[in-house]
């Protein structure tokens, strides 16, 4: 506020003022001890004259005032005791009015006036009216403000309100209100005028110091809020209009903001609701620089809490049309305050929506109306780039998700997706993730194609690239999390009616196909499994599974074939092969042999043309064999074709051990442990013997390249297959076959440098232990094992 020299001067002036107060207070106390009224008045007036200074800032003046205030309390005690000064309080009240300077005179008058009221020798209202009028004589902003603050303080417990010791006639409450209102009005005028004190160069610091004095003015409103007998009618007709008149007319940013805050905080919620129109009208008349959004937000928060306090008050909100009034007021504020940044408007919409969801959660039209107003405002700006505004829009969109446990409710809001369209790509994804998380958290089921359409429009930022953003630029971990969330969401889409479920699948498929090669491997599998689940549902319900109805397994399999085919162009052949096999198994369960055969054909074509990696080939072969084993829909010709292909691929794998394992796995294709399953023991034996030859070749290659035959694991694995089929009753597997294989393994182990013991291979040891256990156990199976010598 001041230069360094000015600050030093001010400190010096404050020190001089305090010294003056202390000096005169010393003589005043001597006079008090001597009960010398004339000297008391003389030195108290001199002491209070120090408050006449105009050299101090508000903060420094406050320090000086508090020193004088402490002395005035001692003076009041003296004035109360008539035996000490010998004058009736009426005469004393007249006497102090002869003090030379007006400021000391008024402080003394207020002090004696307090004693005068307490003596009840005059009505409280008359004394207070006299004092509040005479205080007009001090018009210096700082001196006048502190004088009236002193008057408010000494009169607080002496107001003529209902139930007090100073209660008067029928209009007693009005008298108390009138005094406080008059003092408030004058104090606010003085407070506002402080900003014009001193040069313009010190305005910023002056405003800060003026802000520190705001409670001196605000205390009057707190007193008004606590006066007994101020009912709704008096508040509506007198108190609020007078206070708001002063707020609006003062044309001061700081005063308007602070006083509106005070009004909202100190008066009852019920009063705010019943005077909502008046209060909101004042908000629209505030200075453009006033942060009206905070004022309105605080008002809506209070009203929301009031509504939540009891269901009985909700009808009051409907009676006064609270939502319509708040909505109109917010619209006016946004339209008139042209300088309000977009974040301010969004904050107001968030507050209004929060109010609506708490007070009228059943009125979706209100919720959609707020979102619609937000769309209009967002459409008026070229592009939403303010991060704070974006955060508020996310809060706006999140509020319905948090309020309604069923996400379907939010999907019915027509303006919801229109708000999301104004988000940037990154924020759109954040919001889409929040929507999916809300569905997962509440375990919501989206059960109609229309709602799925709306939902996938909302989360399109996760499904496809927006604004030409390249998916390759995204963080891999974040990208995977997003796509896994979409995959989980697909499993939450369900309907018991097959036709509607098929519509849902088609809607999802249409959206997912726009996702590009990087997303499809995440999103296609859950779609396929969802469709397969529908197929199994139809199969369990019976009916014409290949008929002309809109939802039949045959038609669903056509969609599945087209969907999986897209994966082959990604390319993602291993995943496509797995899905083809899943569909083949489902087609088998529906007894659709041609469809199942077609899916196997597609799987074999992928294997031949797309899968070149040796490890991937091994995995694919075992998947093919495992699936083919479980399928029993094929006739002899088709099954022979497929099993021949599978065994042929197995024998052509790159590594001998892989060949061996794949070939002996094919043995299960000819012996299915099921009453109706195929049981071709001869071909089982052929597979096992072929596997044995491959294992032997692998041993010879190991011996040639490494100088030792290596482990006998392959032989032991084949031995276990022999034992399996032997126990299953394959007549072509005999004890002598098992015996020969055991001896072969023993020989292989002993020939490896001649120092390997029988027990060096745990797998082989465990297998022999099993055979021994079965032999000892006896019974039919034990008898079968008897010819085998260990």
Swiss-Prot record:
Tissues in which the UniProt entry reports expression: Expressed in siliques and maturing seeds (at protein level).
UniProt GO cellular component terms: cytosol; endosome membrane; Golgi apparatus; retromer, cargo-selective complex
Membrane topology recorded in Swiss-Prot or TrEMBL: Peripheral membrane protein
GO terms under biological process: protein transport; retrograde transport, endosome to Golgi
Major localization listed first in the record, in broad terms: cytoplasm
Keywords, alphabetical: Cytoplasm, Endosome, Golgi apparatus, Membrane, Protein transport, Transport
Domain of life: Eukaryota
Cystine connections: none
UniProt cross-references to SUPFAM superfamilies, sorted A to Z: ARM repeat
Pfam family, one: Vps35
Parts of the chain that traverse the membrane: none
Entry keyword annotation includes Phosphoprotein: no
Subcellular location: Cytoplasm; Endosome membrane; Prevacuolar compartment membrane; Golgi apparatus, trans-Golgi network membrane
Subunit structure: Component of the retromer complex which consists of VPS29 (MAG1), VPS26 (VPS26A or VPS26B), VPS35 (VPS35A or VPS35B or VPS35C), VPS5/17 (SNX1 or SNX2A or SNX2B). Component of a retromer subcomplex consisting of VPS29 (MAG1), VPS26 (VPS26A or VPS26B), VPS35 (VPS35A or VPS35B or VPS35C).
PANTHER family cross-referenced by the UniProt entry: VACUOLAR PROTEIN SORTING-ASSOCIATED PROTEIN 35B, VACUOLAR SORTING PROTEIN 35
Biological role: Plays a role in vesicular protein sorting. Component of the membrane-associated retromer complex which is essential in endosome-to-Golgi retrograde transport. Also involved in the efficient sorting of seed storage proteins globulin 12S and albumin 2S. The VPS29-VPS26-VPS35 subcomplex may be involved in recycling of specific cargos from endosome to the plasma membrane.
Family that this chain belongs to: Belongs to the VPS35 family.
UniProt name for this protein: Vacuolar protein sorting-associated protein 35B
Organism: Arabidopsis thaliana
Top-level taxonomy: Eukaryota, Viridiplantae, Streptophyta, Embryophyta, Tracheophyta
């Amino acid at each position: 506020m001041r230069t360094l020299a000015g600050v030093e001067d001010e400190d010096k002036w404050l020190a001089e003022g305090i010294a003056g107060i202390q000096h005169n207070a010393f003589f005043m106390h001597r006079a008090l001890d001597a009960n010398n009224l004339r000297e008391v008045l003389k030195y108290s007036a001199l002491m209070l004259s120090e408050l006449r200074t105009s050299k101090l800032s508000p903060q420094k003046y406050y320090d000086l005032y508090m020193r004088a205030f402490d002395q005035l309390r001692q003076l009041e005690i003296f004035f109360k005791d008539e035996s000490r000064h010998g004058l009736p309080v009426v005469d004393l009240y007249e006497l102090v009015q002869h003090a030379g300077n007006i400021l000391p005179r008024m402080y003394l008058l207020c002090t004696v006036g307090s004693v005068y009221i307490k003596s009840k020798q005059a009505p409280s209202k008359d004394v207070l009216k006299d004092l509040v009028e005479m205080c007009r004589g001090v018009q210096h902003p700082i001196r006048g403000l502190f004088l009236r603050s002193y008057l408010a303080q000494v009169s607080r417990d002496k107001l003529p309100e209902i139930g007090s010791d100073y209660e008067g006639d029928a209009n007693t409450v009005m008298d108390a209100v009138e005094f406080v209102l008059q003092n408030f009005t004058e104090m606010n005028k003085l407070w506002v005028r402080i900003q014009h004190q001193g040069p313009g160069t010190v305005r910023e610091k002056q405003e800060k110091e003026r802000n520190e004095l705001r409670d001196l003015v605000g205390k009057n409103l707190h007193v008004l809020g606590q006066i007994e007998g101020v009912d709704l009618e008096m508040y509506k007709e007198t108190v609020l209009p007078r206070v708001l008149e002063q707020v609006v007319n003062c044309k001061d940013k700081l005063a308007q903001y602070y006083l509106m805050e005070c009004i909202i905080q100190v008066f009852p919620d019920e009063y705010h609701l019943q005077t909502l129109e008046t209060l909101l009208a004042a908000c629209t008349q505030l200075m453009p620089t006033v942060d009206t959004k905070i004022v309105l937000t605080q008002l809506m928060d209070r009203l929301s809490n009031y509504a939540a306090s009891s269901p009985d008050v909700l009808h009051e909100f409907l009676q006064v049309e609270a939502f319509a009034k708040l909505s109109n007021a917010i619209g006016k504020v946004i339209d008139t305050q042209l300088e309000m940044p977009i974040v301010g408007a969004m904050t107001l919409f968030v507050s209004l929506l929060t109010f609506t969801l708490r007070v009228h959660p059943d009125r979706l039209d209100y919720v959609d109306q707020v979102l619609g107003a937000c769309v209009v405002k967002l459409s008026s700006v070229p592009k939403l780039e303010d991060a704070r505004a974006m955060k508020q829009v996310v809060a706006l969109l999140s509020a319905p998700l948090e309020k309604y446990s069923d996400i379907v409710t939010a999907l019915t809001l027509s303006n919801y997706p229109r708000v999301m369209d104004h988000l940037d790509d990154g924020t759109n994804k954040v919001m889409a993730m929040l929507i999916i998380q809300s569905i997962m958290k509440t375990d919501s089921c989206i059960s109609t194609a229309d709602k799925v359409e709306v939902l996938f429009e909302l989360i399109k930022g996760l499904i496809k690239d927006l604004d030409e953003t390249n998916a390759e630029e995204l963080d891999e971990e974040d990208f995977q999390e997003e796509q896994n969330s979409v995959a989980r969401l697909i499993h939450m889409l369900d309907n018991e009616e097959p036709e509607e479920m098929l519509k849902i699948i088609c809607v999802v498929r249409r959206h997912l196909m726009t996702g590009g090669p990087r997303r499809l491997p995440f999103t296609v599998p859950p779609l396929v499994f969802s469709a397969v689940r529908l197929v199994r549902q139809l199969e369990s319900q019976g009916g014409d599974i290949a008929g002309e109805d809109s939802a039949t397994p045959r038609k669903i399999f056509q969609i599945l074939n087209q969907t999986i085919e897209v994966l082959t162009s990604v390319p993602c052949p291993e995943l496509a092969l797995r899905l083809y096999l899943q569909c083949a198994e489902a087609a088998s369960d529906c007894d659709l042999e041609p469809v199942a055969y077609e899916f196997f054909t597609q799987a074999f074509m992928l294997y031949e043309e797309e899968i070149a990696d040796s490890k991937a080939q091994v995995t694919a072969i075992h998947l093919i064999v495992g699936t083919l084993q479980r399928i029993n829909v094929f006739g002899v010709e088709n099954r022979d074709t497929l099993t021949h292909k599978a065994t042929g691929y197995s024998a052509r794998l790159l590594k001998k051990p892989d060949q061996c394992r794949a070939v002996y796995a094919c043995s299960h294709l000819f012996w299915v442990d099921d009453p109706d399953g195929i049981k071709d023991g001869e071909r089982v034996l052929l597979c096992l013997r072929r596997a044995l030859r491959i294992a032997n070749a692998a041993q010879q290659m190991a011996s040639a390249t490494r100088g030792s035959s290596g482990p006998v694991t392959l032989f032991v694995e084949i031995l276990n297959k022999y034992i399996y089929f032997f126990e299953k009753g394959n007549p072509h597997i005999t004890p002598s076959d098992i015996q020969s294989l055991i001896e072969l393994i023993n020989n292989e182990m002993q020939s490896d440098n001649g120092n390997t013991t029988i027990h060096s291979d745990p797998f082989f040891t465990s297998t022999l232990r099993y055979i021994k256990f079965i032999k000892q156990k006896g019974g039919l199976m034990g008898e079968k094992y008897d010819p085998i010598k260990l």
